Regions:
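Active-site environment of divalent metal-dependent phosphoester hydrolases
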Residues: 35-39, 84-87, 113-116, 139, ...
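Catalytic pocket-lining loop regions of alpha/beta-barrel enzymes
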Residues: 130-131, 144-248
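Conserved, mostly hydrophobic/aromatic
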Residues: 32, 69, 96, 124, ...
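Acidic, Ala/Val/Gly-enriched low-complexity intrinsically disordered segments
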Residues: 9-12, 17
Length: 294
């Protein structure tokens, strides 16, 4: 067609392409990312890099995360922080409230073992935070410890989403059994209405136990590392064995590239309806589609 080349290079077509990209981006949520405040991200990332031996994919700042999201075609990210002392809860809450936006969904964090944990959970919910992050290794607790039941009950009552690290942890080579799939199963058995999202598909490098204790159970599984660390057929089988309404995409950015993790997920050749649920619908059902603070 005469003049077609000029049209393909025209500002009108570029605008149409940009609009299509925005439509695509608007639906994908990354349920597992990390970022730090501008005044501490360099120091925090250096310490974490030394502890894990992993080279990050961006600098750990909020700007770095947003740039990564743009490159990957991701519209929203859940930003997860971890309180390693009770007093960190307020600092994390204040920062979370300051960064929340249509594209950034910050979760709070409390020390589950602290005597005021249940009170802090209710305070987070009252402030409009949509969820919390806990990490049995960094916060030093067994996930199924009955002493944590008041904490889990408060999370359930406030209808917050709870993301927990599950499985082993690369920074702890001694492989303590703090967050095994079996322990996670005990938590959901005691608290069946808890909106628990088990990071790393329910058990980083403990995939046999994930299949034994968690697949098909009432727990949300976040997808990071499964497609990278398992062979393709096993990863695909595990996806298909779980409730399709309880799977959410996560990358663990900046320790994994968001674009790369999306490519690995797409490489599993999952049914289109399941992919839509994992990337879009299930996160929307947990978080809603509005901005990051309610």
């Amino acid at each position: 067609m005469r003049g077609c080349g000029n049209f393909l290079a025209s500002p009108v077509l570029r605008k149409l392409e940009k609009g299509l990209e925005q439509i695509i981006m608007k639906h994908i949520t990354d349920f597992h990312t990390h970022a730090f405040a501008d005044r501490i991200y360099e120091r925090a990332m250096q310490a974490l890099k030394e502890g894990s031996g992993i080279e990050p994919f961006h600098n750990g700042s909020l700007a770095g995360l947003l740039e990564s999201m743009d490159q990957a075609g991701i519209w929203r990210s859940v930003v997860l922080s971890i309180a390693t002392k009770p007093e960190h809860a307020d600092v994390i809450l204040d920062w979370s409230l300051s960064i929340a936006s249509e594209r950034i969904i910050p979760f709070g964090s409390v020390m589950p073992t602290d005597r005021n944990a249940a009170r802090d959970v209710r305070r987070m919910a009252a402030a409009g935070i949509k969820g919390l992050k806990i990490h049995p290794y960094y916060q030093r607790f067994y996930m199924d410890d009955p002493a944590l039941d008041p904490f889990y009950e408060a999370v359930t009552e406030t209808e917050l989403v709870l993301v927990s690290h599950t499985g082993y942890d690369v920074a702890y080579p001694e492989r303590e059994d703090l967050a095994t799939p079996e322990r996670t199963a005990r938590v959901i058995n005691r608290h069946p209405d808890l909106h628990l999202v088990a990071a790393h598909f329910g058990g980083w490098e403990d995939w046999d136990a994930v299949e034994r204790y968690l697949l098909g159970k009432p727990v949300w599984l976040e997808t990071s590392f499964l497609a990278e660390m398992c062979d393709r057929e096993r990863a695909r089988r595990m996806f298909l064995a779980h409730d399709p309404a309880r799977l959410v995409f996560g990358s663990d950015s900046p320790w994994v590239g968001q674009k790369e993790e999306l490519a690995r997920l797409r490489g599993l050749d999952l049914p289109a309806e399941l992919m839509e649920a994992v990337l879009e619908k299930n996160a929307a059902s947990l978080l809603g589609n509005e901005a990051g603070i309610t």
